[in-house]
Amino acid sequence: MKLRLGTRCVIGGLLALATQLVGAVEAGSSASHEPFAGVWQIDSPVFAVRTMAGEEPPLQNAAAQVYHRHIADRKQGDTSFDSATWCASVGIPRLMFIDSPFEIMIGPRHVAFMHEWNWWARVVYLKGALTSRAPARSRPAHSGHSSIDILPPIENVMTLGPVGLSRGEWVGNVLVVTTDHLIDTTLIDSAGLPHSDALKLTEKLRLRGPDVLEDRIRFEDPQTFTRPWETVVTYHRKPGQRIHEDVCLDRIKAGEPAVKE
């Protein structure tokens, strides 16, 4: 089982960017938002996402057929519909749902989420961190280059990808993050909930206590859902810990599932 060159370049590029951000984040972190920094792990891993009312997401007919087919296939032991089983990125928001820790680093222009699973990273661009010029949407063209500047030009980041493009702002002590440009080859959860590349996520992250982080997520995707809907997940702090290497292919070789659910 091998990762394609393009996949390796994406992972390497994101990790390079997040690594470059570490120094900038620590050097310019905001004291008022510093409590968000640290390592977090989900309280209850989410296998099948439900609405705030505990119901199945409001799916369009075509999307519902795909979703229920995925559920039936998984019950039969067929997970070929889930590209994460061969170590493609689980993407956003699924990275926030799985049983894998992540580290948050706070800076004046960025917030970095560094995930232990296969070392994927997400950078949230705060106001002023991106130029205002927005090109047409496109799927990523793999150039073979893995280095990414600390502030990549917007034409390099506004392509469809597994973690999309995240813009954020602090509203008091709440981090509001809007993510779009999400490629439709990923799934929202491990049960197989699909989405289109029109998916828009709005996250409101806040501390419910010194060691409890809440992420309230709003889903908007008219091609997949009949209406916008929300869910909420919580995480607990892991004091004194750092994230470690968790290579998906190594997990598979050891007979473990690609994604710990």
Which sequence ranges carry the predicted segments?
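N-terminal secretory signal peptides that target proteins for export/translocation
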Residues: M1-T7
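Bacterial N-terminal signal peptides
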Residues: C9-V22
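PEST-like low-complexity, intrinsically disordered acidic/proline/serine-rich tracts
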Residues: G23-E261
